[in-house]
Amino acid sequence: MSGNNMLKIGIPKGSLEEATVNLFARSGWKIRKHHRNYFPEINDPELTARLCRVQEIPRYLEDGVLDVGLTGKDWLLETGADVVTVSDLVYSKVSNRPARWVLAVAGDSPYVRPEDLAGCTIATELLGVTRRYFEDAGIPVKVQYSWGATEAKVVEGLADAIVEVTETGTTIKAHGLRIIAEVLLTNTVLIAGKAAWADPWKRAKIEQIDLLLQGALRADSLVGLKMNVPAHNLDAVLDQLPSLNSPTVAGLRDSTWYAVEIVVENDLVRDLIPRLRAAGAEGIIEYSLNKVI
């Protein structure tokens, strides 16, 4: 295989690592990590993977060290890297929802609006984005870099407020902090280096990866339902069915019965199945989906 037919992909190390490896597994790529090794195996001879800090992946793509990778929209904005955003992949450490960078203060502080922090010190890992947020709002503050344990900075009296990322807000509340504003909504993005995107083979491979990752993410919120329905109840059952497309209806060997199959939102199932049963469906089977393209 020529070197041109090898795609170098950056897998985020840290909080997104497990969720990303699981997503690739559902998409058809098994990533096998080795202890203290930043070059995991992947079951595709056309891919070579590297574990990288999510903050560094945009620069590695810009410099051509990697061809494609996954990072956060937040770090793409922070670095200002000149790369191609292929797609949004809305998943995170614990959910398939975007995360938020929020402005938080001590629960008993007098600050209720960002404007109240004029002249104060803000601690954050997201320096550039935070500075631009306050500059755009015309609020003079001192923004300091936090090397970690950012929530503790206010508690320890090292900062008046923090800008920190959260999915649920639980950790921030646990530290006795109160959110007063949202600075940035962020999610995982698939990005490509410009040279890789301009290469026809690499672009096709990147688009293949994107298609299957998107399909696996979409499947997370969906389930399939199969059921048998007597002919005299068919219309009543079909009236209950939402679907991505029209449900599949096929006559069984016994011409008085039909097999019906649909794909529905997972959140609807607990209410839908009893209604289908009441409408006359029998032998209802629910099954999970791996990908929905």
Swiss-Prot record:
Annotated GO CC locations: cytoplasm
EC number of the protein: 2.4.2.17
PROSITE patterns tied to this protein: ATP_P_PHORIBOSYLTR
Swiss-Prot/TrEMBL cofactor(s): Mg(2+)
UniProt activity-regulation remark: Feedback inhibited by histidine.
Keyword tags: Amino-acid biosynthesis, ATP-binding, Cytoplasm, Glycosyltransferase, Histidine biosynthesis, Magnesium, Metal-binding, Nucleotide-binding, Transferase
GO terms, biological process: L-histidine biosynthetic process
InterPro entries: ATP-PRT_HisG_long (IPR020621), ATP_PRibTrfase_cat (IPR013820), ATP_PRibTrfase_CS (IPR018198), ATP_PRibTrfase_HisG (IPR001348), HisG_C (IPR013115), N-reg_PII-like_a/b (IPR011322), N-reg_PII/ATP_PRibTrfase_C (IPR015867)
Location of this chain's protein in the cell: Cytoplasm
Catalytic activity as recorded in UniProt: 1-(5-phospho-beta-D-ribosyl)-ATP + diphosphate = 5-phospho-alpha-D-ribose 1-diphosphate + ATP
Domain of life: Bacteria
Pathway noted in the entry: Amino-acid biosynthesis; L-histidine biosynthesis; L-histidine from 5-phospho-alpha-D-ribose 1-diphosphate: step 1/9
One Gene Ontology term of the molecular function aspect: magnesium ion binding
EC supergroup of this enzyme: transferase
Primary site of residence: cytoplasm
PANTHER family: ATP PHOSPHORIBOSYLTRANSFERASE, ATP PHOSPHORIBOSYLTRANSFERASE ATP-PRTASE
Cited function: Catalyzes the condensation of ATP and 5-phosphoribose 1-diphosphate to form N'-(5'-phosphoribosyl)-ATP (PR-ATP). Has a crucial role in the pathway because the rate of histidine biosynthesis seems to be controlled primarily by regulation of HisG enzymatic activity.
Record-stated family: Belongs to the ATP phosphoribosyltransferase family. Long subfamily.
Protein name per UniProt: ATP phosphoribosyltransferase
Gene source species: Nitratidesulfovibrio vulgaris (strain DSM 19637 / Miyazaki F) (Desulfovibrio vulgaris)
Lineage of source species: Bacteria, Pseudomonadati, Thermodesulfobacteriota, Desulfovibrionia, Desulfovibrionales
